[in-house]
Amino acid sequence: MSNRTGLVTSADTQREVEQLLYHQAEVLDERRWEDWLDLFTEDGIYWMPASPDQQSGEGQPNIFYEDHYLMDMRIRRVEHPYAHSQAAGHRTSHVVSNVMIKSENQASHELVVTSRFHMVEYRLDDLRHFGGKYTHTLIKSDDAYKIKLQRVDLTNVEGPFDFVMQVWL
């Protein structure tokens, strides 16, 4: 299968990548944090830049820039019985689309994939919408892809947020 970038990938690879991204959305919506964390490599990074033109997360202000250890720490905090900010009523729904494989390095089994997302969050009797672009760097490991880097570019990143994001988009 050839896309507009001229990259030739198999339909099986495209489907496998799509299924990974759809699965990620599902486990986030179901608040299955451990399953979500398992989608990342041990050195995986979740990054949400504070600016759309940001080239690096290191040494820059970010909304999120978390390695495996920090993601695990956030899970422990969110799941803690005294985490009142995460009380019942917090729900999300993710939609992922326009999944495109942008590059493939067959020697390192690494893919760069972009997609679009829309996430609706219901929390504190309020409905919030987030949308934007995901860029995933995926590594094939044990016959399955894992996330080495997930970059989340919010469409409205410069806009005001009425309360702090507690969980990942």
Indicate residue ranges for each PLM-predicted region:
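A beta-strand edge to alpha-helix "cap/lid" segment located at domain peripheries
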Residues: 93, 100-169
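Short helix-to-loop capping/linker segments positioned immediately adjacent to catalytic or ligand/cofactor-binding
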Residues: 24-26, 82-89, 122-125
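Conserved aromatic-histidine-acidic binding/catalytic patches
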Residues: 9-12, 59, 126
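A solvent-exposed, acidic/Ser-Thr-rich amphipathic alpha-helical stretch
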Residues: 42-104, 108-114
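Short, low-complexity N-terminal intrinsically disordered segments enriched in polar/charged residues
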Residues: 1-42
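A generic "alpha-helical surface" signal
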Residues: 15-19, 62, 69, 129
